[in-house]
């Protein structure tokens, strides 16, 4: 906005100088804002769908089924995201040739999410391009050590090389399960846009909540505790 250039306000200064200083200030602020956007972009990935899975009220929505290669075994192939109920499910199925549903695959070294539905479940989608993602996986590991008898945990790396992921597993001494989403198809299905993205689910693979971004140990543990409590309450009321 311009402020009446050419009018004397009694200050004795040439009014034509003030718009120039305002313009310079606006330019500096604008450049700082662009820098912030660029920094934020480091912790995001591009997906074809807007919004994180469950960010709005999804109701009793089942998690999309998937099977991923185990990062520790070096199993080949991409994530399998074929569903077993394509005709009736609210979750989209991949186009193209018919594939074996993810939870029916029998491939050595594959991690099937359906095998984790016997307990509450926490998924972590992460990638090395995110500034805090590696540290957040350390938080995820500590939660795994604390809650693994009550809750299942699975981390899914998005589009990093197998060797890089295995190197990080060894360096950080992670013992929680880690799967690979080599081509990003799974992260797109789950509408992952930030790093890390945590997905929380009730037993049976029913969506409960998501959280995006950095969490302290206390914050993350509180969310897992809340999932456990909500799962018990749900089990007592849902038949």
Whereabouts are the PLM-identified features?
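N-terminal targeting signals for export/organelle localization
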Residues: 1-97, 233-239
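Short, ordered coil/turn segments that flank beta-strands lining enzyme active or ligand-binding pockets
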Residues: 71, 106, 203
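Sequence contexts marking disulfide-bonded cysteines in secreted/extracellular proteins
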Residues: 79-106, 110-117, 134
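Conserved redox-active cysteine motifs that mediate thiol-disulfide chemistry
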Residues: 117, 125-142
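Thiol/disulfide oxidoreductase modules built on the thioredoxin-like
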Residues: 118, 167-175, 182-232
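Hydrophobic beta-strand anchors of alpha/beta hydrolase catalytic cores
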Residues: 122-123, 153, 198
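Conserved segment of the thioredoxin-like fold in thiol-based oxidoreductases
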Residues: 135-182
